[in-house]
Amino acid sequence: MPATDIDTAMLALGENARRASRAMMRATGAAKNHALQAMAEALRDNRAELQAANAQDIDAARAGGLEPALLDRLTLSDKAIDRMAEGLLQVAALPDPIGSTTASALRPNGMRVAQMRVPLGVIGIIYESRPNVTIDAAALCLKSGNATILRGGSEALHSNVALGRIVQAGLQAAALPAEAVQVVGTTDRAAVGKLITMTEHIDVIVPRGGKGLIARLASEARVPLIKHLDGNCHVYIDAAADPQKAHTIAFNAKTYRYGICGAMETLLVDAGVAVSILPRLAAAFSAHGVELRGCPRTLEIVPSATPATDDDWATEYLAPILAVRIVDSLDQAIEHIARWGSGHTDAIVTEDLSAAQRFQREVDSSSVYVNLPTCFADGFEYGLGAEIGISTNRLHARGPVGLEGLTTLKWVLNGDGQTRG
């Protein structure tokens, strides 16, 4: 498609979304829930159509040599469709954040001042090969009163377009504008380039994908992003750690799932407990197929480990590889995380309350844990019900981004004729 045609098509999507966002701002909670329930029913009723569209994507992906793990994410099995439908119903059951107000403050002149939660407006979602994100993102944006433009990966185009039709049918069943959720129907990368610069139509972009995609968007976007580049997460075993807690937390933080952004990538161990804790932990990791890359002091205790380089401290492996460093103090652990961490999720294992409080205060990450594995970095685990992603931004949303993260606050004041003298 010529660049001028893509620009025209994207601008039309943006104009439609902006118009729909005004209607969504007025939508009742009952109407939004009706739409979500209708979508869930339509997913189950139209699974044959969905799977036929998905088969086109799978055939093309196989022919193109897509990795098996990515092929699995692409597949809309019966189980995957049922999961998406259940997810829609779960979002429908969540409290509606729109219109809620903070406690009001009574000013000396008698006026009341409060804040009201309102939608962000129009959200662009850019993601890679998982078609379930089409449903997840549509559900959260709809429930939070936003319009959204969805641009999925080229591998899932047919699946995403088919899912988009189901979402729009659900919106229409609830008398809501179909344009509140629109799927970009081209694989041309120029569409992404246009989307991330349409400041007059798009209020925020949420990218879901690999580091390369997000880095590109961060460098080129004119629209604000809610994002994280990577999840280089740390667990620090303090001198005052309970040995059994340290073992189970560190092991779970790494082995729960290697490919999630909350997986531990570097283990920091206080020198005072390294000799007593590391050998058993290293044996458990070895038995689980995890390769250890250690500092010189780690190699003295775990000779089977590979020597670590500075690149290892900076790497999000998303694989059964773990960097291990022995540190002399809490100060050194905090300094290491400040230098090499990504601001995602970091944890301390300790029975020392003052050390725990200091770690949580001084480690500048979006989530900081005491005596918990980093793999809890997930909106569902936080009680958010669902999440659009995890943000390491300092402005607006930080950490797992649920419904409230897709809203903002406006000031609302009530008076009785007061004037300013």
UniProtKB/Swiss-Prot annotation:
Per the UniProt entry, what species is this protein from, by scientific name?
Bordetella petrii (strain ATCC BAA-461 / DSM 12804 / CCUG 43448)
Query: Any idea what this protein is called?
Result: Gamma-glutamyl phosphate reductase
Q: Where in the cell is it found?
A: Cytoplasm
What GO MF terms are annotated? glutamate-5-semialdehyde dehydrogenase activity; NADP binding
Q: Does the keyword Oxidoreductase apply?
A: yes
User: Is Cytoplasm there in the keyword field?
Assistant: yes
Q: May I have one GO cellular component term?
A: cytoplasm
Xref: PANTHER family: DELTA-1-PYRROLINE-5-CARBOXYLATE SYNTHASE, GLUTAMATE SEMIALDEHYDE DEHYDROGENASE
InterPro entries reported for this sequence: Ald_DH/histidinol_DH, Ald_DH_C, Ald_DH_N, Aldehyde_DH_dom, G-glutamylP_reductase_CS, Glu-5-SA_DH, GPR_dom
Q: Which HAMAP family match?
A: ProA
